[in-house]
Amino acid sequence: MSRVPAFLSAAEVEEHLRSSSLLIPPLETALANFSSGPEGGVMQPVRTVVPVTKHRGYLGVMPAYSAAEDALTTKLVTFYEDRGITSVVPSHQATVLLFEPSNGTLLAVMDGNVITAKRTAAVSAIATKFLKPPSSEVLCILGAGVQAYSHYEIFTEQFSFKEVRIWNRTKENAEKFADTVQGEVRVCSSVQEAVAGADVIITVTLATEPILFGEWVKPGAHINAVGASRPDWRELDDELMKEAVLYVDSQEAALKESGDVLLSGAEIFAELGEVIKGVKPAHCEKTTVFKSLGMAVEDTVAAKLIYDSWSSGK
């Protein structure tokens, strides 16, 4: 008789993954393994996207196997536009399925929203560690949703910024963010005000047209571009994309899914995993962009860590 899979709620996932910083070492390894090709032991196709045009949404399916963890997962993620600030349904919803890789048995069904938020922020922190200017004092976050909170949490754990700024299209949400998080955050009235002189910029918006322009960005700054996950969506303008040194999580995915890359015609310099491995340089003296689309193996790493923690405490 097959055993019933574990069902882990968002609260339980949070309990077993209290700090995003726990993900940094295994994610660095996973990114390096992914960029090593088949010998790296990561089997991961580009996500499959099923448009739900009638309702302005889509379903994404993200499977991966990682030999290092001997872990097999699939994430199901939905995105629906224009939920609005009064909606009780978030724009993104996700569920992660963890399987026993030796026989395919379903081990666990996990809330994927916490996993997505924390692993994405951890990967941005890894990119920033390698690509930020040597003396980085000002952090700017564009957007005030779930990813803004997860990025703020790990960035204030991992780095020492003297000033943190935030901008959001709806200023009330930026003010709520500043009132909610620990530490002082300056709320800015415009993107230009927020990014002026910033050393590290994080874009976590629902923008479909550019909101960040190269002429506003300090030379030598590092940008983590996290939003705009579809081929016709953008957060960054042509000037910034073409003048910066461009790093991505997956070159294959970026050339299929990233509007920031496709519509600007920018040339990809390296995958982040190649920088971690030391086969491509980190040009921290230049303006850099890390285009993060998110990869299934990142969910695999997080899900295995959570499941192992849950299993040990049963």
From Swiss-Prot:
InterPro entries given in the database record: NAD(P)-bd_dom_sf, ODC_Mu_crystall, ODC_N
Inhibition and activation profile: Inhibited by thyroid hormones triiodothyronine (T3) and thyroxine (T4).
Catalysed reaction, written as an equation: L-pipecolate + NADP(+) = Delta(1)-piperideine-2-carboxylate + NADPH + H(+); L-pipecolate + NAD(+) = Delta(1)-piperideine-2-carboxylate + NADH + H(+); L-proline + NADP(+) = 1-pyrroline-2-carboxylate + NADPH + H(+); L-proline + NAD(+) = 1-pyrroline-2-carboxylate + NADH + H(+)
Keyword entries, A-Z: Cytoplasm, Deafness, Disease variant, NAD, NADP, Non-syndromic deafness, Oxidoreductase
Enzyme Commission number(s) from the entry: 1.5.1.25, 1.5.1.1
Amino-acid positions noted as binding NADPH in the UniProt annotation, renumbered to this chain: 82, 92, 119, 144, 146-147, 168-170, 173, 205-206, 226, 228, 292
Residues noted as binding 3,3',5-triiodo-L-thyronine in the record, renumbered to the chain: R47, E257
GO biological process: lysine catabolic process; negative regulation of transcription by RNA polymerase II; sensory perception of sound; thyroid hormone metabolic process; thyroid hormone transport
Broad class of enzyme this protein falls into: oxidoreductase
Tissue specificity annotation: Expressed in neural tissues, muscle and kidney. Expressed in the inner ear.
Gene Ontology terms, MF aspect: NADP binding; protein homodimerization activity; thiomorpholine-carboxylate dehydrogenase activity; thyroid hormone binding; transcription corepressor activity
pH-activity dependence text: Optimum pH is 4.5 for the reduction of 3,4-dehydro-thiomorpholine-3-carboxylate at 37 degrees Celsius with NADH as cosubstrate.
Any one of the GO CC terms: mitochondrion
Coiled-coil blocks: none
Compartment(s): Cytoplasm
Cysteine pairs bridged by disulfides in the record: none
Family: Belongs to the ornithine cyclodeaminase/mu-crystallin family.
Disease: Deafness, autosomal dominant, 40: A form of non-syndromic sensorineural hearing loss. Sensorineural deafness results from damage to the neural receptors of the inner ear, the nerve pathways to the brain, or the area of the brain that receives sound information.
Subunit structure: Homodimer. Binds the thyroid hormone triiodothyronine (T3); T3 binding inhibits enzymatic activity.
Function comment: Catalyzes the NAD(P)H-dependent reduction of imine double bonds of a number of cyclic ketimine substrates, including sulfur-containing cyclic ketimines. Under physiological conditions, it efficiently catalyzes delta(1)-piperideine-2-carboxylate (P2C) and delta(1)-pyrroline-2-carboxylate (Pyr2C) reduction, suggesting a central role in lysine and glutamate metabolism. Additional substrates are delta(2)-thiazoline-2-carboxylate (T2C), 3,4-dehydrothiomorpholine-3-carboxylate (AECK), and (R)-lanthionine ketimine (LK) that is reduced at very low rate compared to other substrates.
The protein's name: Ketimine reductase mu-crystallin
Organism: Homo sapiens
